[in-house]
């Protein structure tokens, strides 16, 4: 169902094509195809994603193959599940009970897809638009976010990526400091970009709360509730329990819980039209 007040897919679209930003896909390939049909996705259109292309849903392999085949018509930031897949491939991390990537890991093009995936950024900037997976903390300026993203991207895409993925996991340091170095600095950066939901006034991360905005732990609030040092419109995913609701006109949540049996949502950048389809896959 289109969520843009009855605006028909394709009406008033630029002749050079439109750009659609979609929420967390997480291996829900059938839902993605249904959403693209709903928006009338054409050969001149572009697809952006807020990350988490893989895991929890049934067909991560098809999602990665489809995204890669779009070439320069596709853009995406890395999400925590994407990084988990890369940590399994390059860092030797074990399969978790909740993972659903067996067919992807066994595919003949698994390494080729992993090589493509690890070239994706942590932050996309396009004029006055930003795309991240989890968010940008209020203690960073956009210049800081850009700098820290590029630092980690260089490591992930460089010869030391295996060492990075072996040391990526962990909740510490939970508070950003400018003097952080090495793996501590990279881990904190990744956690802000891909795992953040709640922070305190100083920017300290809280990792346990994954639910709604009810019953928040004392001293913590959603990252987007603090005065931001970032201008423009920011698109993010990761926090399915929000169902897209932030109460902020310029901070757009796009994870509407498709992998949990709810909906998959996309926004057309040119006019802000919102589109959603019901999940086609059974919830795990």
Give short role names for the model-derived ranges.
Residues 1-70, 83:
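N-terminal active-site segment of His-dependent metallophosphoesterases
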Residues 5-15, 40, 67-69, 121-125, ...:
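A short acidic-Thr-Gly-centered motif at the start of a beta-strand
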Residues 19-26, 129-135, 253-254:
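Active-site-proximal beta-strand elements of phosphoester/diester hydrolases
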Residues 22-23, 47-51, 76-79, 234-237, ...:
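Active-site neighborhood of phospho(di)ester-bond hydrolases with catalytic His/Asp-centered motifs
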Residues 24, 52, 67, 79-80, ...:
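Divalent metal-coordination and catalytic microenvironments
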Residues 26-30, 55-58, 81-87, 138-139, ...:
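Active-site environment of divalent metal-dependent phosphoester hydrolases
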Residues 61-64, 68-184:
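Active-site neighborhood of divalent metal-dependent phosphoester bond hydrolases
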Residues 146-284:
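Acidic, His/Gly-rich catalytic cores of divalent-metal-dependent hydrolytic chemistry
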């Amino acid at each position: 169902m289109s969520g843009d007040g009855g605006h028909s897919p394709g009406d008033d679209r630029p002749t050079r094509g439109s750009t659609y930003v979609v929420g967390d896909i997480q291996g829900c390939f059938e839902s993605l195809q249904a959403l693209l049909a709903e928006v009338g996705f054409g050969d001149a259109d572009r697809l952006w994603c807020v990350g988490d292309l893989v895991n929890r849903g049934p067909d991560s392999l098809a999602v990665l193959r489809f995204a890669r085949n779009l070439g320069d018509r596709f853009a995406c930031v890395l999400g925590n599940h994407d990084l988990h897949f890369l940590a399994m491939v390059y860092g030797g991390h074990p399969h978790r009970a909740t993972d659903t990537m067996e067919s992807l890991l066994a595919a003949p093009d698994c390494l080729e897809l992993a090589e493509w995936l690890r070239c994706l950024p942590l932050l996309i900037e396009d004029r006055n638009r930003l795309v991240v997976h989890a968010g940008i903390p209020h203690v960073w300026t956009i210049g800081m976010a850009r700098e820290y993203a590029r630092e980690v991207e260089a490591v992930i895409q460089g010869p030391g990526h295996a060492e990075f993925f072996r040391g990526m996991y962990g909740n510490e340091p939970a508070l950003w400091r400018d003097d952080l170095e090495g793996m501590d600095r990279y881990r904190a950066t990744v956690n802000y970009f891909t795992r953040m939901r709640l922070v305190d006034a100083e920017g300290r991360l809280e990792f346990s709360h994954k639910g709604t905005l009810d019953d928040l732990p004392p001293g913590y609030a959603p990252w987007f509730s603090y005065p931001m040092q970032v201008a423009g419109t920011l698109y993010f995913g990761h926090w399915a329990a929000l169902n897209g609701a932030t109460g902020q006109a310029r901070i757009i949540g796009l994870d509407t819980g498709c992998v949990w049996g709810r909906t998959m949502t996309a926004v057309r950048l040119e006019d802000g039209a919102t589109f959603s389809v019901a999940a086609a896959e059974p919830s795990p």
